[in-house]
Swiss-Prot record:
Listed result of changing E152Q: Mischarges tRNA(Phe) with tyrosine in vitro but this mutation is not toxic in vivo
A Pfam family reported for this protein in Swiss-Prot or TrEMBL: SYY_C-terminal
Domain S4 RNA-binding per the UniProt entry, residue ranges: 352-419
Official protein name in the record: Tyrosine--tRNA ligase
Protein's organism: Geobacillus stearothermophilus
GO biological process, one term: tyrosyl-tRNA aminoacylation
């Protein structure tokens, strides 16, 4: 199947401006395309992943992707999908975030590809020096207020109010498309479904300034979850692509906990497995859902894509250790990663009675309860059940000399650190 047909099979096409024309172009020519990423935080998150990987699919099919970091548009704020005005971030902050995002995007695209190397650009390079008179004459002149008011991103904010700053955002994004069309021969812009209005504004600007130009837009659907909760969020917050903000273990766990109703769709969106491989996993899901083979494959493929083979191996080791209780064989780095979000307590001093530590660390509310917990077999130290109320924790109980992992009951973990 051709590229557009594959994207449609994967469910990655929400809207296109001219499907037949785009298919013909993609089948006949090497197309330069772009997608923009505004730096609204110091990292991209998994909500960006479907779009990033779609760019990679285009490159693998022989086309040339440009990742555009919104160093300028990030200073303005996109109203699309937002119910209220964004807080304006400082220029220095946006610059720092832009650099981080540029580095992250670089992991997914091939900048050395023979014939179609990817590029990364920053729209501050051309919007920053643009003076207001030139902008109003060369760009603003081509947009009627009526046209802009009809856009969903503006319509949805009429009641609550929208500043002129955010109102003008679509013109800046339209100018990006025109600029890349002129300087890079860029014929296609892709983006999330909320970007349809901004993309079509760019096509309109190209049409008005260049005549009947052949440029196209394609949007990718919003990733949803069958249970109605927001994709990419957990109880502990957003799932980021930066391993310092979301550890590879947490990242792996997010995917392995995917609902049966979502997992095949996510395999199509987020992996490069073939149609045959995904259909085989779909059949296995129907026949033996308890094996969770589709979820394991999804977690492994996406973690490897984002964090690499070694991080995937660590994530699997941590997961298996927590499941089996074999915590003693984890490295210090793996313990830090696997227990990053559990309650922790710093013990200052040497050997300590287990009962005393359980109370001081807040694991058991009183010494009486601590003794009961131990006698009832509810306390595990480094994966081993301890039922001796007189037990003393010594240097032997310190993993890598730095940690003791205590579990109370089936799932309540605590990390003891030593000063």
């Amino acid at each position: 199947m051709d590229l557009l047909a594959e994207l449609q099979w994967r469910g990655l096409v929400n809207q296109t401006t001219d499907e037949d024309g785009l298919r013909k172009l993609l089948n006949e020519e090497r197309v330069t395309l772009y997608c923009g990423f505004d730096p609204t935080a110091d990292s991209l998150h998994i909500g960006h992943l479907a779009t990033i990987l779609t760019m990679r699919r285009f490159q693998q099919a022989g086309h040339r992707p440009i990742a555009l970091v919104g160093g300028a548009t990030g200073l303005i704020g996109d109203p699309s999908g937002k119910k209220s005005e964004r807080t304006l971030n400082a220029k220095e902050t946006v610059e720092a975030w832009s650099a981080r995002i540029k580095e992250q995007l670089g992991r997914f695209l091939d900048f050395e590809a023979d014939g179609n190397p990817a590029k990364i650009k920053n729209n501050y390079d051309w919007i920053g020096p643009l003076d207001v008179i030139t902008f109003l004459r060369d760009v603003g002149k081509h947009f009627s207020v009526n046209y802009m008011m009809a856009k969903e991103s503006v319509q949805s904010r009429i009641e609550t109010g929208i500043s002129f700053t955010e109102f003008s955002y679509m013109m800046l994004q339209a100018y990006d498309f025109l600029r890349l069309y002129e300087t890079e021969g860029c014929r296609l812009q892709i983006g999330g479904s909320d970007q349809w209005g901004n993309i079509t504004a760019g096509l309109e600007l190209i049409r008005k300034t260049k005549g009947e130009a052949r440029a196209f837009g394609l949007t990718i659907p919003l990733v949803t979850k069958a249970d109605g909760t927001k994709f990419g969020k957990t109880e502990s917050g957003t799932i980021w692509l930066d391993k310092e903000k979301t550890s590879p273990y947490e990242f792996y766990q997010f995917w392995i906990n995917t609902d049966d109703r979502d997992v095949i769709r996510y395999l199509k969106y987020f992996t490069f497995l073939s149609k045959e491989e995904i259909e085989a996993l779909e059949q296995e899901l129907r026949e033996a859902p308890e094996k969770r083979a589709a979820q394991k494959t999804l977690a492994e493929e996406v973690t490897k894509l984002v964090h690499g083979e070694e991080a995937l191996r660590q994530a699997i080791r941590i997961s298996e250790a927590l499941f089996s209780g074999d915590i003693a064989n984890l490295t210090a780095a793996e313990i830090e990663q696997g227990f990053k979000d559990v309650p922790s307590f710093v013990h200052e001093g040497g050997d300590v009675p287990l009962v005393e530590l359980l109370v001081s660390a807040g694991i058991s509310p009183s010494k009486r309860q601590a003794r009961e917990d131990i006698q009832n077999g509810a306390i595990y130290v480094n994966g081993e059940r301890l039922q001796d109320v007189g037990a003393i924790l010594t240097a032997e109980h310190r993993l890598e000399g730095r940690f003791t992992v205590i579990r109370r009951g089936k799932k309540k973990y605590y990390l003891i650190r030593y000063a």
